[in-house]
Amino acid sequence: MSNAYDKAHELKEALAETQEFKSLYDLHRQIDADDIAKKMLENFRKLQLDLQQKQMQGVQISEEEAQQAQQQFELVSQHELISKLMDAEQRLSVIITDLNKIITEPLERIYGEPPQEQ
């Protein structure tokens, strides 16, 4: 079993070497050095988290909260660094999703969809 763990550590290192990860890391450092961008991003992420928690608890999000979230999104999207960061997060998320599909492929043989007819 240690072989699977060794491969996971190799994958971790390979992911850290991707341009997508390096770009995201650099953008985080730039935002941390920019007090305005950092505060804007923190406020936006807090609002996102609050709304997600409400949804998970089955609480309906008000029209006012939805508008506030949309306004916050538009505001942070206009900030060049934050916009680049969000794009970089999305690109890395695609890679991680693809890797997860590959890693869990063997489980599809057990739990997945029936084989497709050709």
UniProtKB/Swiss-Prot annotation:
Gene3D superfamilies: YheA/YmcA-like. InterPro entries: Com_YlbF (IPR010368), YheA/YmcA-like_dom_sf (IPR023378). Transmembrane segments: none annotated. Pfam families: Com_YlbF. SUPFAM superfamilies: YheA/YmcA-like. Belongs to the UPF0342 family. This is UPF0342 protein ABC1519. It comes from Shouchella clausii (strain KSM-K16) (Alkalihalobacillus clausii). The lineage of its organism: Bacteria, Bacillati, Bacillota, Bacilli, Bacillales.
